[in-house]
Structures are given as structure tokens and as C-alpha cells.
Amino acid sequence: MTDPIADPVVPDTLAEPRLVVEPGVAARFAAVAEPVLQAMGYRLVRIKVSGEAGCTVQIMAERPDGTMLIDDCEAVSRALSPVLDVTDPIDRAYRLEISSPGIDRPLVRSSDFARYSGHLVKIEMAVPHQGRKRYRGLLDGVEGDAIRIQREGVTKDEDPLVLLPMHDIGDARLVLTDELVAESMRRGKQAERELKQSLGLAPPPPPHAKRSDPKKSSAPKPKPLTKPVVKPDAKPKPKNTKQHRLAADRLRRGDTDLSEGD
């Protein structure tokens, strides 16, 4: 069977730079893997090198719509393995793993934050922002070079909305929720259906069918977390009914010192 190739996309989408890049050995693997992935229509998400004796190199990749099927992983492995054998980025034996980013995936590009707006995220800043390094809350989209977060667990004196500069983010990933699992399943089924159609294993979609927009999330738009507003009563209640009655009696008697006798 022909290896799956991701759908043709605008080159700028594949070449969009990552906000967080790996240092050291992982960076050498990234330099080799990224051009191969882009040529196949995939994007590099993250590379992790773990273990000393039994070294494992995990390469996370995805289609531009955020999906990655088993067939995709196998195709990438077959294309990338011989290239890595020639370039030899590491001086010891290792085991290569090609995987999808997973449901609670890392967010590594500006488009990731836009796509998963409305989902719960946790952020660790490389540079502290407003005296904090860790944030958790609803992702509320992108604003220029920053992301908007509706923070969880804020006090009544704190503003829940915070803007975090993207270039200061050290790590960002989705938090596993029921809504995220449901959307991930929807995306996976859509990608599998489109793959079968492209390989001729399933009938093509009807002409009027609309393709899902990979840049958009089906998650509900986050509602702004506003501070509680205390509304005044329609009719002010007397603070001391007895005091008011005594004051009224003194007024009727012509007394000028209304505090006398309280």
C-alpha cells in the first residue's frame, strides 16, 4: 500500500517556527528530522531523548490539522530512519519512536494556541511573568505575540485574564478533559476517513460536503471570568429602626441635636 502523505498545504503552515526548541542532542535530531517531515507534509512537534544505556529518541509529529494516524507514524519512520543512519546525530545505539503529540499534547506554535482556544491549558514560563512562572486556566486565543489565559482559582481582587508573551513560554500543554477527549476523537475519525478516501478505500465525500477547518476548535468559546458584582438593594434597609423612631420624635419636638438619647 502506498505510504500516506499529508494533504497539500500552504508552505508557510509547514514552515511555521516552533516557540520552544530542544537543546543539545535533541536539537541535532531536529535539524535532520524537520526537513524530512516538511517534505512529506508533516510538522515536527517535539523531540525527546531519554535513557543512557537504552537510549530512546521520541519524535512527535503531526499533520497540519493536528492529527497523526498509525499509518502516518509508520510512513515517517520508514522515510526518516535511513536519513538518520547516514547523518548519525548521536554516537551510540538508540531506539527510534515516531508518535503523535497525544491528546494532552504540547503547544509549540502560535497556531496551536489559536486552534485549541477554549480548552484548559497549563503553562510554565521560561521567564517569570508578574512574579509567577506557572499558569493554569482556559486558553482564550492569541493577541499579537501573546496568548490570553482565563486563570483558575483567582481571588476576588485579581483579574482572571492574563496575557503571556509567547517568546517567554518554556512549556505549554493541554490538560486532559472530557471536552478535549471528545474533540480529539472527532479529529481522529475525520483524518482516518479522509485518508481512506485519498487511498481509494472509501467513497469520496459528496460535492456539497464541507471539510472541517483544522485551524478551528469545536470547544466552546471561553466565557470571561469576571469579578463578582454586588448589586445594591432596590430599597435601602434601615440600619437601626429604633434610632430612626427616636430621631423622628425629637424632630417633631423641635430638638436640633438628633444624636441625643441614642
From Swiss-Prot:
The keyword Cytoplasm applies. InterPro entries: Ribosome_maturation_RimP, RimP_C, RimP_C_sf, RimP_N, RimP_N_sf. GO terms for biological process: ribosomal small subunit assembly; translation. One of its GO terms (cellular component) is cytosol. Gene3D superfamilies: Ribosome maturation factor RimP, C-terminal domain (2.30.30.180), RimP-like superfamily, N-terminal (3.30.300.70). Residues 185-196, 246-256 have a biased composition (Basic and acidic residues). Keywords: Cytoplasm, Ribosome biogenesis. It holds the Pfam family DUF150_C. It is found in: Cytoplasm. It comes from the Bacteria. Residues 185-262 are annotated as: Disordered. Belongs to the RimP family. Required for maturation of 30S ribosomal subunits. This is Ribosome maturation factor RimP. It comes from Rhodopseudomonas palustris (strain BisB5).
